[in-house]
Amino acid sequence: MVLLHPILAESCTRYFLLLPSYTHPNHLFHFPSISFFFFFFFFFFSFRRNCLFRIVKDEVKYSGVYYYIHTKQDKETFLDLTFYFNCFCIPYNKKDLLFNVGVIRPLLDLQ
């Protein structure tokens, strides 16, 4: 029988259910480990479908700057980065955080 620390179990459950992490007092501590797991998880299954990605800038939705990763065929099956950022990165500026993430920066440089 595995016993988890109650605070650790609560925070893992919060991320697993994709609830906003900014309600957790230690969201900065949990950000590099748990939220990146979901990010690479979606990327892994996207690359298994042999999709090439490109960054598309959209300034229309909700009067903000949003970025999407579209497939090469521009289908509706895309990973919505705004949903990811709203779930895990609400304390940060979404645009600055996007350009500072080392995984996304090379995709932007390829354009």
Swiss-Prot record:
Key word Membrane present: yes
Record key words, sorted: Membrane, Transmembrane, Transmembrane helix
Membrane topology: Single-pass membrane protein
GO cellular component labels: membrane
Transmembrane spans: 27-47
Subcellular location: Membrane
Taxonomy, superkingdom: Eukaryota
Protein name as annotated: Putative uncharacterized protein YGR069W
